[in-house]
């Protein structure tokens, strides 16, 4: 649908409302509608940050008699994918439907208009972090990355053995804002090494610093510890501490880890030791870590590191051949995929994928399929964190020749589990 407010005609006629592009001067009512749909107040500094990050030209609204009934936004990201490339990716967010618009096709119309726009714009991938998990599968999004939440009894856990040379790591607690450039330089080096990470650009580097008092829940302001080796920044951790006292006047504080990164295992071990040994605390909560978190192989007693695995990043292939050619493959693959995609018919059909560690070619074909799946399942497999074998076990992928599941699983695999370090869904911003 064009930005002129012309009626959307996909599916049944809907004469009472239409989908429009957001006029540049309408950000405030648009965002107010988003807040209303999420049923929660928001600190002024959070609203201000979203105002600076928002891209009104990429936002859509559904209006009925002038009132906003539905919203959808898109952020311009660059995401790391298997092979180390960082590619243009549409970050879908601020999707909402007011109560009066439910069961009337509003969400479907927004998703339809948005996907058509993404295709015209040339982004091969769209991603989102869902506030409600069941919503987006019917629009072609598949769960591609999970996150690990750790609840650690820190008085019962120590690093099993210091990493060799860890005593050579220098630690210093620094102001998070003043240390931002150093942290971002390190993050940029790590970005290509793990699929699913977004480049911190256009103000997104400020999201980890977001720390409104109303969201602290008794914690002190966020702090930052920097790890240095041989005069360079080798790691950092941002965290907050909430100290509580028991009835026996014993300190039972909690360290809440916002993020912790390092490019050297010695620096990583030193940072975790610092966190685990924080005075006046007995608990460490790390709500968003990769599922292949190295800490679990460092600690003396993993049973006191209680894990919870959650869904995180959902991936949608907007343009199948461009998306599959953007990444590389861990082992050689030559296969025909039969992909179902009713919501994006340009993706529907059979595709021959030939690829290896250097690159890939993906073209339409009439050859018999080796694998049949829908586009959401392909999105789940894209970053290498969900295998074709497990999707087949769930009935999401069907193999038509022996051995192809093992071949596809190996080819699409990633050395590091995909992970999204920060949420860009408004309701999932860090509340530590």
Model-derived features: where do they sit?
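Conserved active-site alpha-helix within GNAT-family acetyltransferase domains
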Residues: 119-124, 129-150, 270, 290-307
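Intrinsically disordered, low-complexity, positively biased terminal segments
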Residues: 1-28, 82, 164-432
């Amino acid at each position: 649908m064009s930005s002129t407010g012309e009626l959307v005609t996909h599916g049944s006629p809907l004469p009472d409302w239409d989908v429009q592009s957001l006029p540049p001067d309408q950000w405030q009512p648009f965002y107010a509608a988003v807040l209303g749909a999420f049923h929660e107040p928001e600190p002024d500094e959070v609203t201000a940050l979203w105002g600076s990050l928002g891209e009104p030209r990429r936002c859509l609204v559904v209006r009925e008699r002038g009132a906003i009934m539905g919203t959808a936004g898109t952020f311009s990201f660059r995401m790391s994918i298997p092979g180390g490339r960082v590619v243009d990716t549409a970050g879908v967010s601020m999707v909402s439907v007011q109560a009066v618009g439910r069961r009337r096709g509003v969400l479907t119309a927004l998703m339809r208009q948005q996907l058509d726009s993404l295709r015209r714009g040339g982004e091969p991938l769209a991603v989102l972090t869902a506030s409600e998990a069941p919503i987006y599968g019917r629009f072609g999004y598949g769960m591609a990355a999970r996150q690990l939440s750790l609840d650690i009894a820190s008085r019962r856990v120590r690093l099993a053995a210091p990493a060799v040379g860890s005593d050579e790591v220098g630690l210093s607690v620094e102001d998070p804002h003043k240390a931002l450039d150093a942290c971002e330089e390190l993050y940029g080096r790590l970005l290509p090494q793990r699929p699913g990470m977004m480049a911190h650009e256009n103000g997104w580097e400020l999201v980890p610093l977001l720390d409104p008092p109303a969201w602290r829940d008794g914690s002190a302001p966020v702090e930052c510890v920097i790890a240095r080796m041989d005069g360079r920044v080798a790691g950092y951790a941002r965290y907050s501490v909430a100290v509580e006292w028991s009835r026996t006047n014993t300190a039972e504080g909690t360290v809440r880890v916002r993020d912790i990164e390092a490019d050297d295992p010695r620096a990583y071990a030193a940072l975790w030791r610092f966190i685990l040994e924080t005075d006046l605390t007995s608990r460490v909560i790390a709500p968003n870590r990769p599922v292949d978190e190295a800490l679990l192989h460092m600690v003396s007693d993993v049973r006191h590191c209680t894990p919870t695995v959650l869904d995180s990043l959902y991936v949608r292939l907007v343009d199948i051949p461009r998306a599959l050619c953007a990444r590389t493959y861990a082992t050689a693959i030559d296969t025909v995929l039969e992909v179902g995609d009713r919501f994006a018919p340009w993706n529907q059909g059979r595709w021959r994928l030939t690829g290896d560690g250097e690159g890939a070619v993906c073209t339409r074909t009439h050859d018999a399929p080796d694998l049949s799946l829908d586009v959401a399942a392909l999105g789940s497999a894209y970053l290498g964190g969900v295998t074709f074998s497990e999707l087949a076990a769930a009935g999401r992928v069907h193999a038509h020749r022996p051995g192809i599941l093992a071949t596809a699983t190996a080819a699409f695999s990633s050395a590091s589990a995909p992970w999204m370090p920060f949420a860009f869904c408004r309701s999932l911003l860090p509340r530590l």
